[in-house]
Amino acid sequence: MTSIVRTLRSLTLWELVSGMALTFRYMLKPKVTINYPFEKGYLSPRFRGEHALRRYANGEERCIACKLCEAICPAQAITIEAEPRTDGSRRTTRYDIDMTKCIYCGFCEEACPVDAIVEGPNFEFAAETREELLYNKAKLLANGDRWEPELALRLRKDAAYR
C-alpha cells in the first residue's frame, strides 16, 4: 500500500506542488525585509558595540587606572599604562584596545568600578587597514563624547540589573 502511495506522489510531483504552495503562502504575507542602509533594525538596550571611554560632567576622564578591565579581558585586547598625579590619584597615560582581538564579551564594562569603559551603540565601524582598528585613548574618549547621552541613558536603565 505504501509503495502505491509513494508511486502516485512521485508521478503527480507532490513535492513540487507542496513547495509551491508554501512559497505562495509566504508571498502573500507582509514583507519583513529591512532596506539596511536606509532603515535600521531594532538594537537591544544591552547591545555591545564599539568601545568608548566616558568622562565626568566636569570633563575629567572617569578611568582611575585600576587595570581591572585589562586583567579580566579574555582576549588580552586592552593595554593600560598609568602614572600617579600630584594629588595622589592615578590616571592613564596610555589606554589602547586592539579591536581585532576583542570578542565583545562585555567583561571590561562589568569589571569597571566607575563605568569608565563602555560598549556603545555603534556597529558600523568597518576599516580598510588593521591600524584603524587599534584604538588609542584619544579615539576612545572621542567615542565617549559622541555617545554620552545614549550611554548615560542606557546605564541608568540597566542599573537595577547590575
Curated annotation (Swiss-Prot):
Pfam families reported for this sequence: Fer4_7 (PF12838)
PROSITE patterns: 4FE4S_FER_1, 4FE4S_FER_2
GO cellular component, one term: plasma membrane
Gene Ontology molecular function: any one: 4 iron, 4 sulfur cluster binding
Biological process terms in GO annotation: aerobic respiration
Membrane-related topology note: Peripheral membrane protein
All copies of domain 4Fe-4S ferredoxin-type, residue ranges: 53-83, 93-122
Protein localization: Cell inner membrane
InterPro entries listed in its UniProt record: 4Fe4S_Fe-S-bd, 4Fe4S_Fe_S_CS, NADH_quinone_OxRdtase_chainI
Amino acids binding [4Fe-4S] cluster 1: C63, C66, C69, C112
Keyword Metal-binding: yes
Family classification: Belongs to the complex I 23 kDa subunit family.
UniProt-recorded name of the protein: NADH-quinone oxidoreductase subunit I
